[in-house]
Amino acid sequence: MKIAVLVKQVPGSESSLPINESNDWIDESSITYVMNPPDNFALEEALIIKEKIGSGEVVVVSMGPSRVQKVIREGLAKGADRGIHIQEDENIETDPLTISERFTEALKSENFDLILTGLQSDDTGMGQTGVLIGEMLGFSTATLVIETDLKQDKIRVKRELAVSYTHLRAHETY
């Protein structure tokens, strides 16, 4: 099974966010960046799935300037098999659709069986990228997943809802 894990580099929770001199963005030079914590959970789940089935490939995918290579290396250190860096030097905090289109373009040729993302990023918190990518690639999509169970060509996920849990099943391409 070939699993992609999308990871975003976000400002650490202890970082200050000073405004730059032109007052139109933050001064990124003083920020400590980390892997988005929800994406870290997705990476952990991908590694668990690979271990359970006994084979496969986990690929960490991130988009942004050269500094995002740090979170790709972190993913590799945790057990991912390889990383893909989608180079983007511009301010990519535009909109989820544009970001999703860039990811989809990079993911298409890889033929992943499963794509995992965190619930949302700790910086902008939009939570739309994974769902949009799923739609663009024609994948079944589930959000708020807290547990997975793979059997042959099917995946069963447990989703955490406001007051209960629900289970969903998907076939072949997850």
Q: Where do the model's predicted regions map?
A:
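N-terminal beta-strand-loop-alpha-helix module at the start
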Residues: 1-63
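Glycine/small-residue-rich loop that forms an oxyanion/phosphate-binding "nest" at active or ligand-binding sites
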Residues: 92-107
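Short glycine/serine/threonine-rich phosphate/pyrophosphate-binding segments
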Residues: 14, 41-43, 68-70, 123-129
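Single conserved hydrophobic/aromatic residue that forms the stacking wall/gate
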Residues: 167-170, 174
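Anionic-ligand binding region
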Residues: 148, 154-165
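Short Gly/Thr/Asp-enriched flexible loops that form oxyanion-binding sites at enzyme active sites
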Residues: 124-137, 141
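A glycine-rich helix N-cap at a beta->alpha junction
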Residues: 71-95
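Short beta-strand-loop elements within alpha/beta enzyme cores
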Residues: 110-121
